[in-house]
């Protein structure tokens, strides 16, 4: 019974809530004009067909300003371990899926800090935020 209550279903539920927490943090940072590369006027998530991969995909958090044609795409990962490079590359591969934006920024939210190697590899391309950072002032 414990496995049923705290197994995959629980992890999936917490992962979905983590996406909501990440969006709330982004909205707060936007309101404070802090930590974000632009002032967003639209917030949400995206799902649809990726014509390059010929599959359905989603983007966990999306912030946009249609007037300046800037968009931020975010991945929210609530797992103890995962392939960091694969997750970041998948997010980078989603650039261009939302038409009408010329400047795309990326942010990865994770339960635990990304490795230094991953942070160094994607420095300047991707911002990384941990669950702990979401609650700092």
Question: Across the structure, where does each feature detected by a protein language model lie?
Answer:
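A cross-kingdom feature that marks ATP-driven nucleic-acid transaction machinery
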Residues: 1-137
